[in-house]
Amino acid sequence: AVTILKAGLCPSGKMPVVIDNGFGGVIFHEACGHGLEASSVSKGLSVFSSKLGQKVASEFVTAIDDGTIPNAWGSLNVDDEGTKTQRNVLIENGILKSYLVDKLNGRRMNMASTGSSRRQNYRFAPTSRMTNTFIANGPHTRAEIIANTEYGLYAKSMGGGSVNPATGDFNFAVNEGYIIRNGQIAEPVRGATLIGNGPQILHQIDMVGENLARAQGMCGASSGSIPTDVGQPALRVKEITVGGAKGE
């Protein structure tokens, strides 16, 4: 907190951004994960509709939703339609492999349930939802990612944001950020916001670390508020719009 109080204003513009592990995964959850739920896909409201088997991300991106992780915040033995939860590989090396499917939307799509039907309680009708959703480890270390970034923003801690679930357009505040200069973390900055489109950003991820961490949250949707995990290793988006209080 003291570091941020002394920080200068973040410059704005398009630049590489290194997003640290853990809660950084909220961007994938919000801007991409909801678009992989069958409740959106079956109605044609998702940018991922009819794209199974197609390249939807860079080859470094493998995304998983796993409701079976022991003691994880979003885990459960069976979903709210009585189907056993499972490990669902959504995107593998950039290729769209699966959606999160409940029984109702599965019938519409001619697909089997993936154990992804959830609701807050009996007052809500269950529908397809995420459990523990994360981007898997990649081949790089965080140190390598920083060292290979000549100039950019290091988003160490992410804050809140807003998303248009139909398009994946998002903006998220950076709670703790630093300028990367000459492959090294330099001065702290404040007032940074990441602005982009989730499905497009997936193609811009060009380095993925090996330090996967998960963070806990509550996800609200038509079937109520449910516990979910988000997660990712440190990763680099080679170009994203950074909104800052300081113009270039």
What role is predicted for each listed range?
Residues 1-248:
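N-terminal small-residue-enriched
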